[in-house]
Each structure stands twice: as C-alpha cells, then as structure tokens.
Design a protein with these regions (language model features):
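Substrate-binding pocket helix/loop in short-chain dehydrogenase/reductase
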Residues: 90-92, 96-101
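Conserved glycine-rich Rossmann-like NAD(P)H-binding loop of the short-chain dehydrogenase/reductase
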Residues: 22-36
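C-terminal helical subdomain
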Residues: 175-176, 183, 195-241
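Active-site helix of classical SDR
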Residues: 115, 151
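The beta1-alpha1 cofactor-binding region of Rossmann-like NAD(H)/NADP(H)-dependent oxidoreductases
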Residues: 31-32, 53-65, 97
Length: 247
C-alpha cells in the first residue's frame, strides 16, 4: 500500500513493486491520476491494483477508506507512507501559517492516521513492514526550512518510536531520508513557479523518483530477519542539506 501514489516517489514505488509482481493499493487525492496509474500498471504487469481516493489530512476519510478495503486485500505486506509536501521557502517571521498547518497535517498527522488505520491488519498477520518517507531535512535544519524541517524531524522520531513499540509484533519500520530529488516536489513548494522549481536543481544531477523507488524496494525485499531502520540517500553532489558541488 502506497500513499501519495499519484506522482513522484509514490507513483515510482507503485511501478517498482508492480514490476516485481506485487498487487498494489494506491492512494492519493487526485482520482484521475490514480485511475490512469491503475490502468497502466494492470496493463503492463498483469497485476491487480486497488485505488483509494482520500486526503491523508482527514482522519475520518482515512479510516473510512482503510475500513472499506475488501477482505481479499487485507493481507498488506508493506505500507509506504509517502504522502507529503513542502510549501513555501520563507523565513519564520514571514511564512504562512496556512502552509505550516498543511505541512504538519499531511507530513505528520497523515502518516499517523494511515499507520494507525493499517496497523491492526499488520498485527493480525504478526508481520509487515512500514516504510516512512523522511528527508535529509529531518536530520539537519536549513535556512527557511523551519516547519517543513520540523515535520520531517517528527517523521524521524516517529519512525524510531514505531520501531521500538512494534518490535513485539514482528513489524519492521524503516525511515528513508532522501536529499534533493527532481519530482513535482519543488513545483508544489514554489506554488507552480516553474522557474523557481527548475533553479532548485541547477548545476548538479539530483536523485530521481526511480532512485527512491529502487531504495524502497530494496529495503522491503531483504530477508525477513533483516530490517534497515534508517537510510539517508543523496545524489553524488550533495552532502547533508547545505553542501552541494555545483558546476
């Protein structure tokens, strides 16, 4: 099951798992994109896709969608908590409170709502794997990152807490922390400004959505007794959040 599957990391993860024969549950807010992805994956790989359209920010909608999953789909082996976003790149004093609320509601509350709703299915199986999409911004704060960084620090802490608390239930928890990756992320962050979004990747080759999907699949495909707890991945020309070797 993959949240935020309508684009970027989520769509690439759905493609990766489907290419290895997994049936996949894809979720997002944009139903048209989910429908298109479902048709593509089923046609290309001959697998089954269950599409659930909901906003992870809405707890009732999350619970209703997860509660509607047919019995045949309830044996979820991997949950990829991918839904997330950044909005704006402003200093603390100038940033939008509405942007802050949307980031916290999506990146933190959304992860909690989905995890809490899916967890009983994993516990009933006494196995499963929760993969949370963190960020290098959850490891090191950067200028004008403020609440986005805080939301990803929360993902980092929650991943560690979940790993400990779910240990008796044989459930793996992994936090994957990407650096700069060229998806719709910057376009969303800069609210549709293509120039600003493109400038974020000037002078170096960033990660791709496929790079992250490969990493997610690698973590999920290890032997049952192996769990990668925390993995940070950047492109060659990035170290941490600040340091880039740009041409």
């Amino acid at each position: 099951m993959i949240t935020g599957a309508s684009s970027g990391f989520g769509a690439a993860c759905a493609e990766k798992f489907a290419s290895h024969g997994y049936d996949v549950i894809i979720t997002a807010r944009r139903e048209d994109r989910l429908t298109k992805l479902k048709k593509s994956l089923e046609s290309k790989y001959g697998i089954k896709v269950l599409s659930l359209c909901f906003d992870v920010q809405q707890m009732d909608a999350v619970n209703k969608a997860i509660g509607s999953i047919p019995d045949a789909w309830k044996k979820i082996s991997v949950l990829v908590n991918n839904a997330g976003l950044a909005l704006g790149r402003d200093s603390f004093d100038k940033a939008s409170m509405q942007d802050w609320e949307t980031m916290l509601n999506t990146n933190v509350h959304g992860l909690l709502y989905v995890s809490k709703a899916v967890l009983p299915l994993l516990m009933a199986q006494k196995k499963g794997h929760i993969i949370n999409m963190g960020s290098v911004a959850g490891k090191e704060v950067y200028e004008k990152g403020n609440v986005y960084c805080a939301s990803k620090f929360a993902v980092d802490a929650l991943s560690k807490a979940m790993r400990i608390d779910l240990l008796p239930h044989h459930i793996k928890v992994t936090s994957i922390n990407p650096g700069a990756a060229e998806t719709e992320f910057s376009l969303v962050r800069f609210k549709g400004s293509e120039d600003q979004a493109a400038a974020a990747y000037d002078g170096y080759t960033p990660l791709t959505a496929e790079d992250i999907a490969n990493t997610v699949y690698y973590c999920a495909s290890l032997p049952e007794h192996v769990c990668i707890n925390d993995l940070t991945i950047t492109c060659l020309e990035q170290a941490g959040t600040y340091y880039f070797n740009k041409e």
